[in-house]
A protein has these predicted regions:
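Polytopic transmembrane helical bundles with strong interfacial aromatic enrichment
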Residues: 1-314
Length: 314
C-alpha cells in the first residue's frame, strides 16, 4: 500500500471546500424554499448580461446561489490540481478529478433547470447531484487527514449483516431518502414515500448504534460518528414533521412564509449532514472492522460425509 505524505494545509483546504459546499447546499435550499428558481430567467447570463443584477426579491437567492456555485467550482478545481501535484495516492487524485467533473455536471443541470422552466426530473437530479458532490468533498477532507489509513488493526465482526454491510446499506438508504425528499419538495411525489423512507433510515441508524455500542464500545472512531448520526437523525425527524405541518398551515399563502422557508431549508441542510455522517460511519467501519469470515461449510461426497472447516495447523 502506497503511503501518503500528510500535508496539513491541503487537509485544511479540503475541509474549507467541504464547508463551502455545505453553504452551497443551503443556498440552493433557500432558492427552492422561496420559489425563486426562475427569478433569473436565463442562464449562464443573468437578464442577458454577466453584470451583477439588482439583488432584490428572489433574484438575491437565485443569483446568490449561482455566485456561490461559481466560487465552489473554482475552489474544487484548485483542490483537484493540488491533489494531483502533491498526493501520491492515485485513487485520491482521481477522486479530486471526479469532484471537478461532478460540479460541472451539476452546473449544467442547474442551467437546464432554469432554461426548461423547472422540470421535475431535472430539478430532482440537480438536488441529488448536490448531495453526491458534497459527499465527494467530505471524502476528500477525510482522506487528506493525518490519521486516515485502511490498514488499521481491525476488530473481528462475525455478525450478519456485518457492520460494513449495515453502514453501507444505511448510507444508500439515506441517499434514496434525500432523492425522495427532493421529489416531494419539487411536487413530483407525495408524502407517503418520504415517510416510508424515514422509517427505513431510522431503523438502519438505530441498528448501527446498537451494533456499535454493543460490540465496539471502546472504539471512538466508531462510537462518535454513530452518536452524531442518531442525534442528527432525531433533529431531522423533528424538522420533517415541523416543516410538513407548517406547509399544510400555509398552503393558501400567496408566497412562502418565513417560518416555512427557515424550517424547510434547515431540514435540507440537516439531511445533507445525515448523509455525510452515515458515509463517514461506513468509511470508519471499513477502516476499523473486518468484513467477517464465512463459517465452516459442509460438503458431501459420494462416500461418508466429510466436514470441511477452515484451514489450520495440526
Amino acid at each position: 500500500m502506497t503511503r501518503k505524505r500528510y500535508n496539513p494545509w491541503l487537509h485544511r483546504y479540503a475541509i474549507f471546500v467541504a464547508a463551502a459546499t455545505f453553504l452551497l447546499i443551503v443556498a440552493g435550499a433557500l432558492v427552492t424554499s422561496n420559489d425563486a428558481g426562475l427569478s433569473v430567467p436565463d442562464w449562464p447570463t443573468s437578464f442577458g448580461t454577466f453584470r451583477m443584477p439588482r439583488m432584490v426579491g428572489g433574484v438575491k437567492f437565485e443569483h446568490g446561489h449561482r455566485m456561490i456555485a461559481g466560487l465552489v467550482a473554482i475552489l474544487t478545481t484548485i483542490l483537484a490540481i493540488w491533489l494531483w501535484r502533491s498526493d501520491c495516492r492515485r485513487w485520491v487524485r482521481r477522486l479530486g478529478a471526479l469532484s471537478v467533473l461532478t460540479i460541472l455536471i451539476q452546473a449544467a443541470l442547474g442551467g437546464i433547470t432554469v432554461l426548461f422552466y423547472l422540470p421535475i426530473t431535472i430539478s430532482v437530479s440537480h438536488a441529488c447531484m448536490a448531495q453526491i458532490f458534497f459527499s465527494l468533498a467530505v471524502c476528500l477532507a477525510f482522506f487528506t487527514g493525518e490519521k486516515w489509513k485502511l490498514d488499521e488493526p481491525k476488530s473481528a465482526d462475525r455478525a450478519s449483516p456485518s457492520l460494513r454491510q449495515l453502514t453501507a446499506g444505511t448510507t444508500a438508504l439515506v441517499f434514496l431518502q434525500l432523492m425522495v425528499g427532493a421529489g416531494f419538495r419539487h411536487n413530483g411525489l407525495g408524502i407517503v414515500p418520504h415517510l416510508a423512507g424515514a422509517i427505513l433510515v431510522t431503523a438502519g441508524a438505530i441498528s448501527i448504534v446498537m451494533r456499535v455500542f454493543s460490540q465496539f464500545p471502546g472504539e471512538p472512531g466508531l462510537t462518535r460518528p454513530a452518536l452524531v448520526l442518531i442525534i442528527l437523525l432525531l433533529i431531522q425527524l423533528g424538522l420533517g414533521i415541523g416543516s410538513y405541518i407548517l406547509k399544510l398551515a400555509a398552503r393558501s399563502a400567496p408566497q412562502p412564509l418565513p417560518p416555512v422557508v427557515e424550517v424547510t431549508t434547515i431540514h435540507v441542510a440537516i439531511g445533507a449532514l445525515v448523509l455525510v455522517t452515515s458515509l463517514v460511519m461506513a468509511l470508519q467501519a471499513f477502516r476499523f472492522v473486518d468484513g467477517g469470515a464465512p463459517l465452516p461449510v459442509a460438503k458431501e461426497s459420494a462416500g461418508p460425509r466429510v466436514i470441511v472447516g477452515s484451514v489450520g495447523s495440526t
